[in-house]
Every structure is written in C-alpha cells, then in structure tokens.
UniProtKB/Swiss-Prot annotation:
Any one Gene Ontology BP term: tRNA wobble position uridine thiolation
Disulphide connectivity of cysteines: C128-C224
UniProt-annotated location(s): Cytoplasm
Gene from which the chain derives: mnmA
Protein name as catalogued: tRNA-specific 2-thiouridylase MnmA
Record-linked PANTHER family: MITOCHONDRIAL TRNA-SPECIFIC 2-THIOURIDYLASE 1, TRNA 5-METHYLAMINOMETHYL-2-THIOURIDYLATE -METHYLTRANSFERASE
C-alpha cells in the first residue's frame, strides 16, 4: 500500500532535495523517524518510506493527556500521538510510543521553573533537544539497529572536508539552528534532517499529495507544555517563591518601587515596569535573584561588550575566530570573536539575557553553525 501512495506524489522538486545521506541500497537501510504528530515529522516519515528503507516511527509521550493535549498544534501529547500513529498506519510502517513524562518533567519543566527562580530567561526547547529528544532518541534508535535518526527540524546536515556539518535551513523563516546548537558531533553524524532544503509550503504540499490527515495541522506555537502561553502561572505553581516581591532599583541605586516577582521580567523588557515620572523610558537591565531586585535603567544601560558562555558545545574550532553570534532566537547574528568561551561583540549589543544561548555561525560561510553556549554572565560596555 505505501509504495503505491507515495508514487503518486507530485512534488518532484521537494523530493529531489530530501536526502537521507545513506550509502548503499536503501532497501538494506533502517531509518528511525522521530514523530511528534505534526506535518513536518510526518512528511519525513513519508520520504523515508518512499526511499525504500525500512522505517520505524517513534513518538515520545512528554506530558499528560489532560487539557494540554487538546490544543491543536501541540507536541508529543494525546492527539499528537494519535496523529503520528495514523500516519504510520497509512504509510505502512511500525510505530512505537515511549513514555518519557518523568524525564521531561525533571530535565525540562522543572529546570524551566528553576531558571526563572534564578533570574534567568530559559529556552526549554534547547533543553528538550539536548536531552529527551536527541540523547534519548539517539540511544533508542541505536538499540533498534537504525542507520540514522531522522527528524522534522529545519536545519541542514552538509558533508564537509572534515565530516558532517550543521548549516542553516534553506527557508530562513523556518530555520531552527539556534535551538540545535547543543547537538554534538556524534549526534550530528547519526542524525538526518531531510526538510532542511525544503520550504514549508512544499512540505505541506507533500503531505496533501499523500492524503495525510495532518497536512493542514497548525504548527506548534509557544512552549509545548505551556498551552495558553501563561508561563508565569506554571512557574508559580511549581515554585511559589518565584512571585516573592522585591524592589525595582535604578542603576544609579535609587529605589523606584516594588515588583510582583522576578518571573514577570526579563532583560531588555520595557513594558510592565510601571514606574512613572521618569525622564526617559526604563528597561530591565538585570535581575538579582539573591536580593530579589529588578535593576532598571535607560536603554544605553543595556549595552554589553560581551558574555561568558557556559556548557559550550563546539562543532568546529572557534578560538580566536571571527564569527557571527546570535543571542536570541529572533535576533540578527552580529560580528564577534571567541576566546576561552568568552564572547566579545565587535559592537555593543543590547538586551542580552543570561539563560539564553549564544549560537555562533561562520563569518565567511554564514550558514554554517559552529556551536554555541549558554549565556552565564554579560559584561557592561564602557
């Protein structure tokens, strides 16, 4: 059944650009596909099946089947698991579901709350990719005897002179390289990202041509375990002390008022400070978890010359190298240099928040991902 349906596919350009980079006859290859129940991973599974390889779909159940699971466009919960199973049944391959709720809660959700408690701005999607998705799925795929693990992430795996390299996706609006900086070289050697060379509209066209029920399913939005976007409510439930009040203090030392909890603030924020009578707009400059203070100041006080990176992961030698640094998921990469895990911007940057990641790209080949690290500390520009 599966070969007949896939043969009717009318997206030759998209198919030509989807490559699993496996040597030898595909009929002798086994591909494990990480399936979230969305259109992207479903199309990856379809392309894998079309290649002639043996396909095994795997879905990790990451949180409960309660109210969160009812939201359309979520990830790895009730309806999403059923959607993944339906795709596997339609295309004719085996599908496994593994319960990873406890690990997801311990390594992603609890860590998310702890970061806010520490006055940092977390990125749970990176933590999830680092642990539950890539580390756990990597091990599972190995145990299943797979030749590779394929995912629906929009990033490219390119073979360079020294082995596999990570590059940005062709579709800049969909590029997810910022969230994948912690992928190790060992993982990159085993991973495949067949959608990295495709645009999203082509992916949806492939899904429609296959008659997949997820073809029109909305993309995942916000943080998957915060379905209504109210992250403060979740953190408050897990860590009630996160809403302890404290002082709002100007960078000159003047106490301006009181705040309702550090979880409501992040570096660079302007709205929500609610301090009137100031000569110029105020921004959150830093958060002091020890004293429960929100430090504010004019925009010029946000300028930083660099940052210290922790838990860095490098896919190439970056020491003393000219790089482009991206310090927020939606930020434009800016020129910088790295020395001993200390990032120095060639021009001051604004709104650089501890807890976020600094992801580095090759200054010459602007698409290549060199790795990155977590922003532990920033240095005020003189």
């Amino acid at each position: 059944m599966a070969p007949t349906m896939i043969a009717t596919l009318s997206s030759p350009v998209g198919l030509a650009q989807a490559d699993f980079q496996l040597a030898g006859p595909m009929k002798d290859r086994r591909i494990v596909v990480a399936m979230s129940g969305g259109v992207d991973s479903s199309v990856v599974a379809a392309l894998a099946a079309r290649s002639g390889a043996e396909v095994i779909g795997v879905t990790l159940q990451l949180y409960d089947h309660g109210a969160k699971a009812k939201r359309v466009g979520a990830c790895c919960a009730g309806q999403d698991i059923r959607d993944a199973r339906a795709v596997a049944d339609r295309l004719g391959f085996v599908h496994h579901v593994h319960d990873h709720e406890s690990r997801f809660r311990d390594t992603v959700i609890d860590q998310f709350a702890d970061e806010y408690l520490a006055g940092r701005t977390p990125i749970p999607c990176v933590r999830c990719n680092m642990g539950v998705k890539f580390t756990d799925l990597f091990q599972l795929a190995r145990e299943l005897g797979a030749d590779c693990l394929a995912t629906g992430h929009y990033v490219r795996r390119v073979m360079g002179p020294d082995g596999a390299e990570m590059h940005r996706a062709v579709d800049p609006a969909r590029d997810q390289s910022y969230f994948l900086f912690a992928t190790t070289q060992e993982q990159l050697d085993f991973l495949r990202f067949p959608l990295g060379g495709l645009e999203k509209n082509v992916v949806r066209e492939i899904a429609r041509d296959l008659g997949l029920g997820v073809a029109g399913k909305p993309d995942s939005q916000d943080i998957c375990f915060v379905p209504d976007g109210d992250y403060a409510s979740l953190v408050r439930k897990l860590r009630p002390e996160a809403e302890d009040q404290g002082d709002i203090v100007h960078v000159d030392g003047t106490v301006l008022g009181a705040h309702k909890g550090l979880i409501h603030y992040t570096v660079g924020q302007r709205r929500g400070i609610d301090i009137g009578g100031q000569a110029e707009p105020l921004y959150v400059v830093r958060l002091n978890a020890a004293t429960k203070q929100v430090i504010v100041g004019p925009r010029r006080a946000l300028a930083v010359s660099g940052a210290r990176l922790g838990d860095a992961n490098w896919l190439a030698d970056v020491e003393g190298r000219d790089v482009l640094a991206k310090v927020r998921s939606m930020a434009k990469p800016v020129p910088a240099r790295v020395t001993a895990n200390r990032l120095r911007f060639l021009s001051p940057e604004y709104g650089v928040a501890p807890g976020q990641a600094a992801v580095l790209y090759d200054a010459a080949d602007k698409s290549r991902v060199l790795g990155g690290g977590w922003i532990e500390e920033t240095f005020t520009a003189e």
